[in-house]
A protein has these predicted regions:
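Acidic, metal-coordinating catalytic segment for phosphate/diphosphate chemistry
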Residues: 1-22, 94
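Residue-level preference for beta-strand/loop junctions
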Residues: 17, 42, 96-100
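Conserved hydrophobic "DFG−1" position in protein kinase catalytic cores
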Residues: 25-26, 34, 106, 125
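Conserved Nudix-box catalytic region and its N-terminal flanking loop in Nudix hydrolases
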Residues: 27-68
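A short coil-to-beta-strand element that immediately follows conserved catalytic motifs
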Residues: 72-82
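Active-site-adjacent beta-strand/loop module that shapes the phosphate/pyrophosphate-binding cleft
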Residues: 82-112
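NUDIX/MutT-family hydrolases
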Residues: 103-107, 114-145
């Protein structure tokens, strides 16, 4: 069992706080990589995920990006840390948690993009000014901050 699964065996479905990381990966055309997730069905979000024991937020970001996309990322730049009442998440099994999401930006990536896990339906390079309607609300906030703070390509 992983850390979160082991924790859940002890506390059940109670709300908890979990740290995680996400990454805005920007290509040479200024588009960003978005992930269409299986749950909530079809929702678009930034690639990323939850921290494992002993990881830094950067290590979490690098691991999650590779696991989900097959891409290796480097030169991560901190965008911000996002948390609060609006960051309540839930899983299909009823588990709930508040995420503390550390968001990074990079244009340093290599590898072949592919759906590598059981969480994803697809990946697309998307114009950050034209997000899909079903983009996660919390990730819209992160992408909005990205658009406000990044005036030129990384």
């Amino acid at each position: 069992l992983g850390y979160i699964e082991e924790l859940r065996t002890l506390i059940g479905h109670k709300r908890i706080i979990l740290p995680g990381s996400s990454v805005i990966i920007q290509n040479k055309d200024g588009f960003i990589l978005m992930q269409q997730r299986k749950y909530p069905h079809g929702r678009w979000s930034l690639p990323g995920g939850l921290m494992e024991l002993g990881e830094s937020t950067v290590e979490t970001a690098i691991r999650e990006i590779f696991e989900e996309t097959g891409l290796t990322v480097g030169n991560l730049k901190l965008l911000g840390v996002y948390s609060g009442e609006g960051y309540l998440c839930s899983a299909a099994n009823g588990d709930e948690w508040y995420v503390v999401n550390t968001a990074y930006i990079t244009s340093d990536y290599k590898g072949t993009l592919c759906v590598n896990d059981d969480e994803s339906i697809a990946f697309e390079w998307i114009d950050p000014n034209k997000l899909p309607n079903d983009t996660a609300k919390t990730h819209r906030i992160i992408i909005g901050d990205y658009l406000c703070t990044v005036k030129e390509k990384i």
